[in-house]
Amino acid sequence: MKSILFVAFAATVSFLALAPAVAQQSQIMGELRFSSPSKAVRDSGVWIDGQYVGYMNELKGDNKISLLPGDHEVAVRQAGYKDYTKVIVVEPGQVRFLTVEMEKDPRAVYPTDRNAAELKLNIGPTRAAVFVDDAYIGHASDFGGYRIMVVSAGKHVVKVELPGYRTFETEVSPLPGQRTEIKTDLVKGGIEQAGSLIKQQ
């Protein structure tokens, strides 16, 4: 009986000791929240200090961005748009709001009807970043279900990356008018096993 009481007491003391530490940490950390008037932009990938953290529309609630106080570089990328980059200052315990507006990239090249091919992705987790020929295209759920990716016919290297998972890479060579499906579930791994594309500036 004494041992049970001791364990219960020890657990209570540990919890009480942990609570102030958690509260103190929440007071130190700042939060970053995004907004954009464009639905397309809200689906863009977000990098903070060179690390991919997810797509904009999911970075809230349980997936909110908590940052240490100080300067941080934010990059937002979307296929067909110029990269948006900004250095922000995060204050302790404060919420930093960032409104993102992106410009369409006039250099973007789109496949013509004659040489267009389709890629359909069935990938988990669906929040993983997708790159085609090292260019960020979107997150996996953008190209699942009834949605497809249109690429030019010919050889392409497709990479799928997410922090905490091993990078998936495959090569496809679709013909004009052909639909190719890529199906995989990423394997969990350490952050050091993540590919360089989700860490790039």
Stretches with model-predicted labels:
Residues 7-17:
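Bacterial N-terminal signal peptides
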Residues 21-201:
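Short loop/turn and low-complexity linker motifs enriched in small/turn-promoting residues
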Residues 1-6:
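Positively charged n-region of N-terminal signal peptides that target proteins for export
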